[in-house]
């Protein structure tokens, strides 16, 4: 991968600044996409049953409309109040109108996106495939928080991510196209088969279909040879997180964040690192 990129002294800082701006938009995506899904289900059900829609359900609600506002006082957020991190500090973490405390998660997501975008640029340099890495990073951040909040992995995000992975690998951007296609198919099939066996033995559903599509998307980006490492690392992360959450809060752990975190780590790690791990996993010690 390194031979495809040219490291520019401006690549990392520019990508980091872009990440801050994108992170601000991802906060909107993380909040609104689940709401859009639930509103869509409600509207569909009511129309099917010939029930009237409320005024709120009839209004346009998407990633662009209505304008962002304070959830308590409903006063629209001004442009200068949307400056990543800076506006949070200037407002001292409170709404300018009603002084309601603003969640620290908003600037943290902006900062996280900026840092991860910078790391992608540092890994891949100044090249067209860096764009693919930034797109993948933005999707994974959004899916991580959406799944953690709601246990949804929206088809509107996982399915395009599969196709984007295949498109960026048409000429071997990250992995050969054949490996990308096989990775998508094997990724989906492996989790589907595992869950089918689990349900057959226990009568319970182990994970949702969204997880199958997410690992298929990661397979499309990372290739089939990365799947053993992906499953191994995500299983470790998922196991630790599930134990911690069960003990601390008594909550169930969504597996999606474990997949997204491990997928991003593998994506940005040096080839020699994850290939060594992959070899260790596929060659038993004698």
From Swiss-Prot:
Its biological purpose is as follows: Plays an essential role in type IV pili and type II pseudopili formation by proteolytically removing the leader sequence from substrate proteins and subsequently monomethylating the alpha-amino group of the newly exposed N-terminal phenylalanine.
Which subcellular locations apply to this protein? Answer: Cell inner membrane
User: Which Gene Ontology cellular-component terms appear in the entry?
Assistant: plasma membrane
List the source organism.
Neisseria gonorrhoeae
EC numbers listed for it are 3.4.23.43, 2.1.1.-
Q: Where are the transmembrane segments?
A: 10-30, 102-122, 126-146, 157-177, 181-201, 224-244, 250-270
Q: What is this protein called?
A: Prepilin leader peptidase/N-methyltransferase
Instruction: Look up keyword Ion transport and say if it applies.
Output: no
What is the reaction catalyzed? Typically cleaves a -Gly-|-Phe- bond to release an N-terminal, basic peptide of 5-8 residues from type IV prepilin, and then N-methylates the new N-terminal amino group, the methyl donor being S-adenosyl-L-methionine
Textual note on the cofactor: Zinc is required for the N-terminal methylation of the mature pilin, but not for signal peptide cleavage.
UniProtKB keywords: Cell inner membrane, Cell membrane, Hydrolase, Membrane, Metal-binding, Methyltransferase, Multifunctional enzyme, Protease, S-adenosyl-L-methionine, Transferase, Transmembrane, Transmembrane helix, Zinc
In its keyword annotation, does this UniProt entry include Zinc-finger?
no
**A UniProt-annotated Pfam family:** Peptidase_A24
According to Swiss-Prot or TrEMBL, what is its membrane topology? Multi-pass membrane protein
What cofactor does this one take?
Zn(2+)
Entries under InterPro entries matching the protein: Peptidase_A24A_bac, Prepilin_IV_endopep_pep, Prepilin_pept_A24_N, Prepilin_peptidase/N-MTase
Positions contributing to Zn(2+) binding: 70, 73, 95, 98
Q: One MF term in GO for this entry?
A: methyltransferase activity
């Amino acid at each position: 991968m390194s031979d495809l990129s040219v490291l520019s002294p401006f690549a990392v800082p520019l990508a980091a600044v872009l990440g801050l701006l994108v992170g601000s938009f991802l906060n909107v995506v993380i909040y609104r996409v689940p709401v859009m899904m639930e509103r869509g289900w409600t509207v569909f059900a009511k129309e099917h049953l010939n029930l009237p829609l409320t005024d709120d359900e009839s209004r346009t609600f998407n990633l662009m409309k209505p304008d962002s506002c304070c959830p308590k006082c409903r006063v629209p957020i001004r442009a200068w109040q949307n400056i990543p991190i800076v506006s949070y500090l200037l407002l001292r973490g409170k709404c300018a109108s009603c002084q309601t405390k603003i969640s620290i998660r908003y600037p943290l997501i902006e900062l996280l996106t900026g840092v991860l975008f910078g790391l992608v640029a540092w890994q891949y340099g100044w090249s067209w495939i860096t764009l693919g890495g930034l797109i993948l990073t933005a999707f994974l951040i959004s899916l991580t928080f959406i799944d953690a909040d709601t246990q949804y992995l929206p088809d509107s995000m996982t399915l395009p991510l599969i196709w984007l992975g295949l498109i960026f690998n048409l000429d071997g951007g990250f992995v050969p196209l054949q490996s990308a296609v096989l990775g998508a198919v094997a990724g989906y099939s492996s989790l589907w088969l595992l869950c089918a066996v689990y349900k057959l033995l226990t009568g319970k559903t182990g994970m949702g279909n969204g997880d199958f599509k997410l690992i298929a998307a990661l397979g499309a980006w990372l290739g089939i040879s990365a799947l053993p490492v992906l499953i191994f690392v995500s299983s470790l992360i998922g196991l630790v997180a599930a134990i911690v959450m069960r003990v601390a809060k008594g909550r169930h752990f969504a597996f999606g964040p474990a997949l997204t975190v491990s997928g991003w780590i593998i994506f940005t790690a040096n080839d020699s690192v994850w290939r060594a791990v992959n070899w260790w996993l596929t060659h038993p010690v004698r």
